[in-house]
Curated annotation (Swiss-Prot):
Subcellular location as annotated: Cell membrane
Membrane topology type: Multi-pass membrane protein
The organism of origin for this protein: Bacillus subtilis (strain 168)
Pfam families in UniProt: DUF1294
Membrane-spanning ranges: 5-25, 36-56, 67-87
Alphabetically ordered keywords of this record: Cell membrane, Membrane, Transmembrane, Transmembrane helix
Signal peptide bounds: none
Protein name: Uncharacterized protein YsdA
Cellular component aspect of the GO annotation: plasma membrane
């Protein structure tokens, strides 16, 4: 239950941060560092970051985000599936 709540919160955070960074880019204001965006994605927020990328059309031309976030999302999905698997792997 706690893990599921964490996953929801970190992915909401990832989505929100991508929206904020896009808006700040349009306004030519301070930006959220790519390192911070990657950190959120790496700590199981890749789904939220990816959804934010698609929704806000942000970082979609950066190869590291374009290919890295979906790859990280697949890895995270596999790890979560293994964790919640009823089988002893």
């Amino acid at each position: 239950m706690i893990i599921a709540a964490y996953l929801v919160l970190i992915n909401l955070c990832g989505f929100w941060v991508m929206g904020i960074d896009k808006r700040k880019a349009q306004q030519h204001k301070w930006r959220i560092s790519e390192d911070r965006l990657w950190l959120i994605a790496i700590v199981f927020g890749a789904l939220g970051v990816w959804l934010g990328m698609q929704t806000f059309r942000h970082k979609t031309k950066h190869a590291s985000f374009k290919y890295g976030v979906p790859l990280l999302l697949v890895i995270e999905a596999i790890l979560i599936a293994i964790y919640y698997s009823p089988f002893d792997l």
